[in-house]
């Protein structure tokens, strides 16, 4: 018998109200309610965790960590002893981060930190001798202008980038490797778009395992259009007469992209060879991944994509000769191909059609319809599946060459969960390392030789961390228990979170996370806030520990008491390729339909105040909120749009064209996906709020400005529309207390919406849209 949607929701609520207590879950039997300061401003109610730098020594299981007093220590799992290598009083002033050399002889410090983009920053770098504790600058004349620095695996040299040029340091000698770096030429570091959309990091250089060679990418931005971001205050208390202007080479849809080249540096004599990756036209080529597939320096794998990222080719570079060959290729024109950055070298194996000399690597692919683990030979041939099924591998976490195992996390139990497994690439046997019959969200960090690991239970209850040996099933010890947090939370009455699946008319099932207010009673009426992100491949509904954040606050404040629903619509991640690809070439359409359908189902519940259902999203979620309002469905009474895209022509090419393809091939799609229809904005009962930072280098303020102009030009009235800019704030909206103001403003609008008793209608609202005089 098939339950109706309403029945499923009622069952879910009943289960949430009487859910069994999980170990380590606060019983929430107290009377205190979460406050704004506790959830938005303070991190006092957040779980603690430790992160370590595993190091390769004679004994596997050594790692480096930083004590609360700032001192740097090495701890050995085998001996259970720790040693201080840099005492707190010897830490350089204004230290931001550190990296110990592989030979443990020195520490590389980054100081004088200045944020650049999402991942990148500028800093000064110092080298500290572990034995003498003396510190010397990496470069004598540095002025907080070094972009990146990294130890070689041997620990006797450093590659670094300054002024967009690649340099090396060896025993105090600094050598310039490139000299033509500048505003349009980047060596060893990505430009803005490669950092944000392709590499997801601040470096584009890779030492070979034996430190003989260094592969690095060069990005040429000649011809890439410039977008200027203005900073009106520029970190000053009083505004300068003229704003500082930052010119960013930012290719938008169908504009010129940066070109990219692969180079290999011979570290012994500082000679550089450029390796042609000519599998696509240079103007179309995107290099998505570079990985050494060798224990020495013989072979390099380069994953290349075409411009719209629906074709990929893995090129193997024979470094001795410079010759290249296409080992594997993929057609993804039914949607797109994600750059998963997962190539991991395994070693020589005698498998399939290969011989004992064939080198193999593992990688993730969804060519079966679900993302799974495969063995690939550098000689080519069909990939060998290591996992299969209607679930997905989410990440490769370690390779154990000695035991011939790949460790990975997957959604085998449920798409909202993560469990840890190993698979033998010799026998193909899969072994769970955690109880995969119990709902949980795990993450893990393995030692250098994969003999030990730190296992992090990340939810749904309060997180903790334990240390394990791969040879034992019981933990060696607990690293963080968060016992104090559990005890503290016993003082509180907390919102109740539950999960369920909502079937939509097309037959797909959507994951939903529901948060019920403190003291929930089915005899009362509650307003609802939908909190989507909804972008391609993203996931918001997961069984991680749900931070006691703004959403928890609005479910706790007695003057708000909102139910929250987070719905992962079609196009989101970890549900298979078909589910993801449904949104290709039509962003915003199906996602909005799904949110509207879910809201209409929620409105049928007896305890939902159907006249007060709001929706709030940030970035893609802000865009989705706009598309939901555009439908003019009447399902939502308030829209809150934070840092939204409003027209995909205004966003960067590499993200947008991955899903929408080019403007010339999908002009109608771009017209449809832009937020241009205004009736829904005119008719939404409680109005809407648009928030955006003027210094947003990612989703430019231009998006909010253009949307605002469209709405005003089409007669949206002032009582419906509120716009808030945040001077100089980037996409995170944190500059000068902006984040606190932002959340206070959201809370104020939600309070106003909850108490809105009737339509707000000024006299001019009764006139035609030409009311402006």
Curated annotation (Swiss-Prot):
Residues 1-18 form the signal peptide. One of its GO terms (molecular function) is aminopeptidase activity. Keywords: Aminopeptidase, Glycoprotein, Hydrolase, Protease, Secreted, Serine protease, Signal. The keyword Acyltransferase does not apply. It catalyses: Release of an N-terminal dipeptide, Xaa-Yaa-|-Zaa-, from a polypeptide, preferentially when Yaa is Pro, provided Zaa is neither Pro nor hydroxyproline. It comes from the Eukaryota. One of its GO terms (cellular component) is extracellular region. It is an enzyme of class 3 (hydrolase). One of its GO terms (biological process) is proteolysis. Glycans are attached at residues 37, 80, 112, 220, 471, 496, 671. Its EC number is 3.4.14.5. The keyword Nucleotidyltransferase does not apply. InterPro entries: AB_hydrolase_fold, Peptidase_S9_cat, Peptidase_S9B_N, Serine_Prot_S9B/DPPIV. The active site is at residues 619, 696, 731. It is found in: Secreted. Belongs to the peptidase S9B family. Extracellular dipeptidyl-peptidase which removes N-terminal dipeptides sequentially from polypeptides having unsubstituted N-termini provided that the penultimate residue is proline. This is Probable dipeptidyl peptidase 4. It comes from Emericella nidulans (strain FGSC A4 / ATCC 38163 / CBS 112.46 / NRRL 194 / M139).
């Amino acid at each position: 018998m098939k339950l109706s949607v309403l029945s499923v929701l009622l069952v879910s609520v009943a289960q949430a109200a009487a859910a069994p207590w999980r170990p380590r879950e606060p019983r929430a039997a107290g009377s205190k309610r979460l406050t704004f300061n506790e959830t938005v401003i303070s991190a006092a109610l957040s779980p603690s965790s430790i992160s370590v730098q595993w190091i390769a020594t004679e004994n596997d299981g050594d790692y480096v960590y930083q004590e609360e007093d700032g001192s740097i220590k090495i701890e050995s799992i085998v001996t259970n002893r720790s040693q201080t290598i840099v005492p707190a009083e010897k830490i350089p002033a204004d230290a931001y981060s550190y990296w110990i050399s592989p030979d443990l002889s020195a520490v590389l410090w980054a100081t004088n930190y200045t944020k650049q983009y999402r991942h990148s920053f500028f800093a000064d770098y110092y080298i500290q001798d572990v034995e003498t504790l003396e510190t010397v600058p990496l470069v004598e004349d540095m002025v907080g202008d070094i972009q990146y620095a990294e130890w070689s695996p041997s620990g006797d040299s450093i590659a670094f980038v300054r002024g967009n040029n690649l340099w090396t340091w060896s025993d105090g000698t600094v050598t310039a490797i490139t000299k033509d770096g500048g505003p349009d030429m980047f060596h060893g570091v990505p430009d803005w778009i490669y950092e944000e959309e392709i590499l997801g990091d601040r470096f584009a250089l890779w030492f070979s395992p034996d430190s003989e060679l260094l592969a690095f990418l060069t990005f040429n931005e000649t011809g890439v259009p410039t977008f200027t971001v203005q900073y009106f205050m520029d970190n000053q208390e009083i505004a300068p007469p003229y704003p500082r202007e930052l010119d960013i080479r930012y290719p938008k849809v169908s504009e010129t992209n940066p070109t990219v080249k692969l180079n290999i540096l011979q570290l012994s004599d500082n000679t550089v060879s450029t390796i042609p990756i000519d599998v696509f036209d240079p103007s179309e080529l995107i290099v998505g991944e570079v990985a050494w597939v060798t224990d020495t320096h013989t072979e390099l794998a380069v994953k290349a994509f075409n411009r719209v990222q629906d074709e990929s080719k893995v090129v193997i570079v024979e470094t001795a000769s410079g010759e290249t060959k296409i080992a594997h290729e993929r057609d993804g024109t039914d949607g797109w191909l994600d750059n998963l950055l997962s190539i991991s070298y395994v070693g020589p194996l005698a498998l399939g059609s290969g011989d004992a000399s064939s080198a193999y690597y593992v990688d993730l692919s969804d060519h079966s319809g679900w993302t799974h683990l495969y063995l690939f030979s550098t000689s080519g041939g069909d990939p060998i599946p290591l996992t299969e099924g209607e679930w997905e591998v989410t990440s490769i976490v370690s390779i154990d060459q000695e035991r011939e195992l790949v460790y990975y996390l997957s959604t085998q139990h449920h798409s909202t969960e993560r469990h840890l497994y190993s698979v033998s690439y010799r026998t193909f046997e899969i072994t769970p390392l955690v109880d995969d019959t119990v709902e949980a969200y795990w993450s893990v960090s393995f030692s250098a030789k994969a003999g030990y690991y730190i296992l992090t239970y990340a939810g749904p209850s309060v997180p903790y961390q334990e240390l394990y040996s791969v040879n034992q099933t019981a933990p060696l010890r607990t690293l963080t228990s968060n016992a104090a947090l559990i005890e503290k939370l016993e003082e509180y009455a907390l919102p109740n979170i539950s999960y369920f699946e909502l079937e939509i008319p097309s037959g797909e099932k959507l994951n939903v996370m529901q948060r019920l207010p403190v003291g929930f009673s089915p005899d009362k009426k509650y307003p609802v806030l939908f909190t989507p992100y909804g972008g391609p491949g993203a996931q918001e509904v997961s069984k991680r520990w749900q931070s006691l954040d703004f959403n928890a606050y609005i479910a706790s404040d007695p003057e708000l008491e909102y139910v929250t629903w987070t719905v992962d619509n079609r196009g989101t991640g970890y549900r298979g390729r078909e589910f993801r690809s449904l949104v290709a070439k039509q962003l915003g359409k199906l996602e909005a339909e799904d949110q509207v359908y879910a809201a209409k189902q929620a409105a049928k519940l007896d305890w939902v105040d159907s006249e007060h259902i709001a929706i709030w999203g940030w970035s893609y979620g802000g865009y989705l909120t706009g598309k939901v309002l555009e439908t003019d469905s009447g399902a939502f009474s308030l829209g809150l749009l934070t840092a939204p895209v409003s027209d995909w022509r205004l966003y960067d090419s590499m993200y947008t064209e991955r899903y929408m393809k080019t403007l010339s091939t999908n002009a109608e799609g771009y017209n449809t996906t832009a937020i241009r229809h205004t009736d829904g904005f005119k008719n939404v009962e409680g109005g809407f709020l648009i928030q955006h930072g003027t210094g947003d280098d990612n989703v430019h303020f231009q998006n909010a400005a253009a949307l605002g102009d469209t709405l005003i030009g089409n007669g949206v009235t002032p009582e419906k529309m509120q716009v808030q800019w945040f001077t100089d704030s980037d996409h995170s909206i944190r500059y000068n207390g902006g984040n606190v103001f932002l959340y206070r403003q959201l809370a104020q609008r939600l309070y106003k919406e909850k108490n809105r008793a009737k339509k707000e209608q000024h006299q001019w609202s009764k006139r035609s849209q030409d009311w402006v005089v």
